[in-house]
């Protein structure tokens, strides 16, 4: 019996060694942790339960039958983050460069199936050279099996991808279908075709970092939701994100202890809005002063900065935040911000996370670039996302809410539950200057008369009270009481029940 137990320990030690000490050292020299080191940092200490440690590939071509390491280049299992269950796979670059084989894919599919059955998130730590060429079509089939599970799990359990090394070719499509993608600066990259292929086909010379590095995907392509300096920071931030999220669409997000007064008065908010209507201010200041303990987890902060998305807590409960940012493009909606916010709203709705919308939007960004790029359909995505959402929705208009953008930003007409406005709010078809130039075109030559007309328009329409008279605004509130009013609103909506008409699925304007 003793010999059998010792053999088990020996086999485990070999499996845990991955590709061997030399390759582990090479991994460390690149500034990267190993697959198992990453899992140890991600999960609560001692909570990891591994599956399929001894699985080996079945390929016999190209001499592969003589090289069959245990685990086949991926570590899979489950554990806990702050006591809550998650499933995880971590690709091992020290074994065949983390390349995906048939059995490698089967290990990933197994934990994804278990995650869906048991209602727990899946976190993928990606560090792979792509498909294992020696296995040919079997490797491609493995990718497709994973893709299908990504699709089936979408909206059922949170899926998080962390790119911690190469992720190229077919490998990119699995992360692309997950809810969140995060990257590590300087050591990770994602692209469908690499620099060599790009050069061959287009004669364009580009580095892997320029083509698919963290900066590219967080600032330009919007493929990634965030980037971190190293593996340790990335894994810490993933733990923090998971703490905001429900385990599945069948369970609520966790309620965490809070020590912040719900009725806290923030007098500084009474002077947040500048006297000059064209002067910007930082909407993040309002978000931080509403949130419990000023804790805000921002999503896609480096992309489409004219709109802010992320998570806060109110009375310990998770709330998704969408807010126009007057500091960038005056808070205008455009193609990128509409796509960014629409995807975030749909995630929140899929997982029953209430949505707080903070509005200061002068309209949609004009220009041929926007029109040629399809701003009509992209803007409709955000409109569609808000309109179909059945979760509690609370909206606060701080300053401008003009034209169609007013409708889009979680207005009362899109089944907003509580729609508040500050006294500084201006809810109108357009600003006073544009309106008077259209309404009183014949008087444009008389500057004094036009100025008087503009002042008349401002007094009559550029305020929250016309909308409040019609019931489109539930209450005009004092800025300093925003946290209290918003918290009370969400508290009253905890038992909200709202269902959309039965359909196979919607047809959002993609």
Swiss-Prot record:
Q: Which UniProt keywords apply?
A: ATP-binding, Ligase, Nucleotide-binding
Would I find Mitochondrion among this entry's keywords? no
Which N-terminal stretch is annotated as signal sequence?
none
CoA carboxyltransferase C-terminal domain boundaries? 264-504
Q: Which cysteines are joined by disulfide bonds?
A: none
Which reaction is this enzyme known to catalyze? Answer: propanoyl-CoA + hydrogencarbonate + ATP = (S)-methylmalonyl-CoA + ADP + phosphate + H(+)
Domain of life, per UniProt, equals Bacteria
- Which residue ranges does the record annotate as region Carboxyltransferase? 1-504
Induction / repression: Transcriptionally regulated by PccR. Expression is dependent on the carbon source supplied: transcript levels from acetate- and propionate-grown cells increase 6- and 10-fold, respectively, when compared with succinate-grown cells.
Q: What class of enzyme is it?
A: ligase
The CoA carboxyltransferase N-terminal domain, residue ranges: 1-257
Q: Which GO terms describe its molecular function?
A: ATP binding; propionyl-CoA carboxylase activity
Q: In which pathway does it act?
A: Metabolic intermediate metabolism; propanoyl-CoA degradation; succinyl-CoA from propanoyl-CoA: step 1/3
Question: What's the Enzyme Commission number for this chain?
Answer: 6.4.1.3
Keyword Transport assigned to the entry: answer is no
The record's family statement is: Belongs to the AccD/PCCB family.
* Record note on quaternary structure: Probably a dodecamer composed of six biotin-containing alpha subunits and six beta subunits.
Q: What is this protein called?
A: Propionyl-CoA carboxylase beta chain
This protein's species is Cereibacter sphaeroides (strain ATCC 17023 / DSM 158 / JCM 6121 / CCUG 31486 / LMG 2827 / NBRC 12203 / NCIMB 8253 / ATH 2.4.1.) (Rhodobacter sphaeroides)
Q: Which gene encodes it?
A: pccB
């Amino acid at each position: 019996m003793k010999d059998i137990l010792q053999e088990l320990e020996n086999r485990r030690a070999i499996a845990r060694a991955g590709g061997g000490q030399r390759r582990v050292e090479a991994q460390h020299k690149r500034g990267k942790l190993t697959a198992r080191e990453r899992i140890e940092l991600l999960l609560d200490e001692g909570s990891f339960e591994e599956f399929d440690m001894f699985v080996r590939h079945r390929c016999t071509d190209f001499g592969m039958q003589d090289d069959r390491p245990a685990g086949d280049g991926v570590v899979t299992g489950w554990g806990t983050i702050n006591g809550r269950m998650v499933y995880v796979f971590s690709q091992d670059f020290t074994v065949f460069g983390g390349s995906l084989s048939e059995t490698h894919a089967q290990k990933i599919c197994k934990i994804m199936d278990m995650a869906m059955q048991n209602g727990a998130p899946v976190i993928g730590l990606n560090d792979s050279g792509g498909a294992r060429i020696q296995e040919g079509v079997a490797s491609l089939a493995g990718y497709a099996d994973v893709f299908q599970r990504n699709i089936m799990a979408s909206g059922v359990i949170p899926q998080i991808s962390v790119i911690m090394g190469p992720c190229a070719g077919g490998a990119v499509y699995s992360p692309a279908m997950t809810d969140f993608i995060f990257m590590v600066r300087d050591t990770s990259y994602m692209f469908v075709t690499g620099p060599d292929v790009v050069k061959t086909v287009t004669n364009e010379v580009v580095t892997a970092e320029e083509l698919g590095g963290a900066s590219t995907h967080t600032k330009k392509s919007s493929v990634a939701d965030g980037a971190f300096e190293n593996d340790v920071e990335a894994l810490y931030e993933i733990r923090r994100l998971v703490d905001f999220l429900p385990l599945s669409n069948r369970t609520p997000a966790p309620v965490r202890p809070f020590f912040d007064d719900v009725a806290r008065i923030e007098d500084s908010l009474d002077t947040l809005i500048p006297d000059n209507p064209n002067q910007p201010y930082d909407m993040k200041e309002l978000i931080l002063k509403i949130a419990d303990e000023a804790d805000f987890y921002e999503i896609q902060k480096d992309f489409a900065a004219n709109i802010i998305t992320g998570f806060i807590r109110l009375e310990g409960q998770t709330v998704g935040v969408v807010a126009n940012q007057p500091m960038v493009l005056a808070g205008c909606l455009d193609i990128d911000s509409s796509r960014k916010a629409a995807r975030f709203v749909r995630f929140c709705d899929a997982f029953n996370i209430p949505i707080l919308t903070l509005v200061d939007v002068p309209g949609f960004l004009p220009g041929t670039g926007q029109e040629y790029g399809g701003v009509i359909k992209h803007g409709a995505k955000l409109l569609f996302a808000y309109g179909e959402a059945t979760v509690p929705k609370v909206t606060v208009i701080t300053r401008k809410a003009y034209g169609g953008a007013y409708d889009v930003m979680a207005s009362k007409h899109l089944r907003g539950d509580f729609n508040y406005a500050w006294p500084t709010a201006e809810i109108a078809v357009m600003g006073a200057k544009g309106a008077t130039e259209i309404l009183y075109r014949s008087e444009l030559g008389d500057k004094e008369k036009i100025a008087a007309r503009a002042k008349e328009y401002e007094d009559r329409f550029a305020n929250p009270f016309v909308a409040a008279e019609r019931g489109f605004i539930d209450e005009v509130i004092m800025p300093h009481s925003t946290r209290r009013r918003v918290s009370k609103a969400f508290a009253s909506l905890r038992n909200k029940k709202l269902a959309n008409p039965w359909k196979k699925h919607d047809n959002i304007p993609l």
